[in-house]
Amino acid sequence: MKIYTKTGDRGMTTLIGGERVFKTDERVEAYGTVDELSAFVAMLTDQLRNVEGAADWVEELERILSQMMTVEALLAVGEEGSDKVQPLSEETVVWLEAAIDRLQSEVPPLTYFTIPGGHPTVSACHICRTVCRRAERMIYRADRKQPQPDEVKGWINRLSDYFYLLGRRLSHFYGVEERRWIP
């Protein structure tokens, strides 16, 4: 089977369930942005993969990557086809919240805004965070056209918090001072 079908050559694509839409459709923009995020998360995971002491973060990120595939599929469901994709479980959101809570407990509280950076892997966390926030905005645009699952909206909202805190935690792991924003 060839990877190309030529069915998208005129700017259309097919959602799960058979609905044909323009590639600029809000749902396509939403799952495309989550797909973009997954590439950045994979890069972040690869940066940490052989770092001593980072195995737990790699495991979390691999789990998040798997969850992202589910989210992409859910966002790609058309008017028909919801029976073809497993929903995102509430447990998935609860697991992510627990990971966020753990990361937050491992870093000192902040009373000021910080500037991203200080280490390439920390910067990668902030790229993931900002692309995640864009994905969330795209999901809400798609939600106006066709309601999107509440679990997806909650999960993507939490995910940007996860990347922010992972960046903070990695700053401490690498011994990098968090840079304070001074207006």
Placement of each model-derived feature along the sequence:
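Phosphate/pyrophosphate-binding loop motifs in nucleotide- or prenyl diphosphate-using proteins
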Residues: 1-183
